[in-house]
């Protein structure tokens, strides 16, 4: 299949990219993304963290565990099912480094985001996902422009693909300390879950086919959290 081969070639090119190292933006290239041909969901994050730099798997640290819990709340049978059905990438493909205080990660430099943008654009063109899950302010702004999380989370935008914004699952974020914002998160997860329920078995089968046989899964409805 031409699209599948094009995706594999694109992924190989991304893994070998070292443009930001050559330009002195970062000291080490560690492009991180994950996904299969046919995935109906596409999640866009900000940038890998230090855990992801080592594992080379998106959202594999503490924030990723929280994201997995959110997706089970949304209606995926398990975190594994969520990741089978979702292509996960970021605005910046490599770890941007720690901040000077050592208590958090640097925001992706605009030049690095610009360097990486063609990877994201090509993935979206090839995969044609049905739903984009936008995690964090930077990813949301990339597709929807500047705006407050309060005005974005809990709503859907565009069609197709439908875009659903989420806050970042980092434990450093205080946004979810507000009960009203937790309700917004629940509403956003419900939108994701409603779409999950509409997926035909054939769509799930196609997204599973690149990684070996999988048993069929049932979707759960969103729960309050």
Predicted features by range, described:
Residues 211-212, 225:
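Residue-identity detector for glycine
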């Amino acid at each position: 299949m031409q699209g599948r081969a094009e995706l594999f070639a694109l992924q190989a090119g991304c893994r070998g990219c070292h443009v930001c190292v050559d330009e002195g933006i970062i000291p080490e290239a560690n492009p991180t993304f994950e996904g299969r041909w046919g995935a109906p969901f596409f999640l866009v994050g900000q940038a890998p963290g230090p855990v992801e730099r080592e594992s080379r798997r998106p959202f594999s640290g503490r924030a990723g565990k929280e994201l997995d819990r959110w997706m089970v709340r949304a209606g995926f049978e398990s975190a594994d099912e969520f990741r089978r059905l979702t292509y996960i990438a970021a605005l910046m493909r490599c770890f941007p480094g720690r901040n000077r205080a050592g208590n958090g990660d640097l925001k992706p430099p605009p030049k690095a985001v610009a360097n990486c943008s063609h990877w994201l654009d090509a993935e979206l063109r090839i995969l044609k996902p049905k739903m984009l899950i936008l995690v964090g302010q930077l990813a949301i702004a990339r597709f929807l422009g500047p705006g407050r999380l309060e005005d974005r989370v809990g709503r859907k935008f565009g069609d197709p693909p439908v875009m659903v914004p989420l806050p970042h699952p980092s434990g450093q974020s205080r946004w979810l300390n507000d009960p009203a914002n937790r309700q917004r998160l629940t509403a956003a997860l419900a939108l994701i879950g409603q779409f999950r329920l509409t997926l035909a078995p054939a769509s799930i089968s196609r997204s599973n086919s690149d990684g070996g046989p999988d048993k069929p899964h049932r979707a759960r409805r969103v729960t309050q959290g």
